[in-house]
Amino acid sequence: MTGYQTKITRIRAQLASEGAAGALLSTPDNIFYATGFSSVMDGWHLVEPIAAVFVPTATASPVVLILPEASVISPIVSERGGHPVHFDRLATFDMLNFCETARAEDAHLALPDDLLAELGDVMEQVEGQCEPDIVQSIAACLSRHVSKEEQILFDDLRVAARVEALTRQASGDALDVMFAARAVKTADELDTLRESGQVADAIMSYTISQLGVGKSWGEVEKQVAHFMINHDVDPLPGSPMLFGGAYDLVFRPDLFRTPVS
């Protein structure tokens, strides 16, 4: 059994003990835990979810990853980078002008044939139609796999409230289930903790060595960033780099919420 299968099995066992029909996870940490999927937009700390995963209690039902239609290629890119994304089926939703931009033809980009073939395979795993937003995509996904009387546990109760208002889906809190499932680490997680822990210790030791009277924290940060880069550790999340840096007081990604006329 792979690390991914072990995680899903643990989640399902906890769901069964609670008498729930499944879990709908829409927070980045839980999505990554259950599928290995992460989005560059996670670093923007948007107030709305940008992906979700439905983990049914029944082993015969599929684990469904819900993501923007424009991000369907993401699992392929991630796997090619050595980070496979695990799911049984996909469901999609629109994301305003983010999807409009992604659908536009790029005159300077020609996708290789093998990538197009893989994309075709992934598209065959998409169920249902592309919904207008993530809440409607979640609601449609649940309606395909469970009845509205069966309880679904959510890790974001705002999402639960919206879905319940839309379809009267019975809902509950997934907090205890996910804590219990994640408390016991898989072999892969333990290996990662051992490896990353040594690197983190080295970075902290170097940081302490750079502290001194008269030094600004900005100077220390620059030195530590160089040390991290030299040890193959990315000192910045990828998302701010898309726009030249983390301009927290200037840039907000509201352009992705603006309707396209």
Where are these regions (language model features)?
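Amphipathic, soluble alpha-helical interaction motifs
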Residues: 203-206, 210, 234, 245
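A composition/biophysics-driven feature that prefers long, compositionally simple stretches
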Residues: 1-199
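Short catalytic-site patches enriched in acidic/histidine residues
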Residues: 34-44, 157-161, 165, 172-184, ...
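Electropositive, surface-exposed helix/loop patches at the edges of structured domains
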Residues: 61-62, 69-70, 209-214, 218
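Glycine- and small hydrophobic-enriched segments that form the cores of compact globular domains
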Residues: 183, 191, 205, 213-214
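Active-site pocket-lining segments that scaffold enzyme catalytic pockets across diverse folds
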Residues: 197-208, 217-225
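Hydrophobic pocket-lining residues that define ligand/cofactor binding sites across diverse proteins
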Residues: 15, 211, 228
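Hydrophobic beta-strand core residues of beta-sandwich domains
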Residues: 146, 211, 260-261
